[in-house]
Amino acid sequence: VILDTTCYPGKDLYSDGAIEDEMLAISRDFAPEEFNRVISERKSWPILYHFSHIRENILSWIPFTGEEKVLEIGSGCGAVTGALCERAKEVTCIELSMKRSKINAYRHQDQDNLKILVGNFQEIEKNLTEKYDYITLIGVFEYGESYIRSENPYVGLSQDHIKASEAGWKDHSGH
C-alpha cells in the first residue's frame, strides 16, 4: 500500500468521533479474517458497517477482467477497497480523512496494487494523470456539497468523474 499525504490539509474535516480510534485499533491489531469475530463481540453499528465483508457485494455485478484501473472516490475505512484490489489491476483511493485512510491502509496492507491519496478530491483531481476504467462513489455522492466547492457541486463532481474516466469509460448502468 502507498499512502500519499501530499494533498492532506493537515486536519481531518470530518470524523465520527472516538469510534474511529477504536476502528483504527481494530484495523491495526486484527487480521481481516478476524473481523467477523470482532464485529460479533463489539456489537457496534459503526464497526459492523465499516468492517463487514457483506458490503463488498455491491461490486459483484461488475465484469472485471483483472486488467482494470479503478478510482475509488471516498474510500473511507476501505469497506470495498479490498474487493476492488482482488478484482482490478490497480486501485487508487481518494479519501478526505487521514484517520480513515490509515484504517484502510492497515486493513489492506498486503495489497501491492493499492494507492491511497489523502485530501480533497478537487485538489487531488488536478494532479491525476491516469485514466480509469471504473470510478466508484459508493456512499459519497450525496455528500458532494460538503467537499466540492462549486455553485452546483453535484454537477461538478459528475463532470470531474467523467474527466477522470474519459479514455476508458465503460457504462454498465443498463441504459
Residue positions per predicted region:
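A short SAM/SAH-binding and catalytic strip from SAM-dependent methyltransferases
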Residues: 134-151
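Conserved SAM-binding strand-loop segment of SAM-dependent methyltransferases
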Residues: 110-122
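Conserved SAM-binding loop of SAM-dependent methyltransferases across substrates and taxa
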Residues: 77-88
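N-terminal auxiliary segments of SAM/dcSAM-dependent transferases
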Residues: 1-29
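A short glycine-rich, Lys/Arg-flanked "PGG" loop and its adjoining helix->strand segment in the class I
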Residues: 152-170
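A short acidic, Gly/Pro-enriched loop at the edge of an enzyme's catalytic core
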Residues: 126-135
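Conserved SAM/SAH-binding beta-strand->alpha-helix loop
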Residues: 97-99
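Conserved class I S-adenosyl-L-methionine
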Residues: 67-76
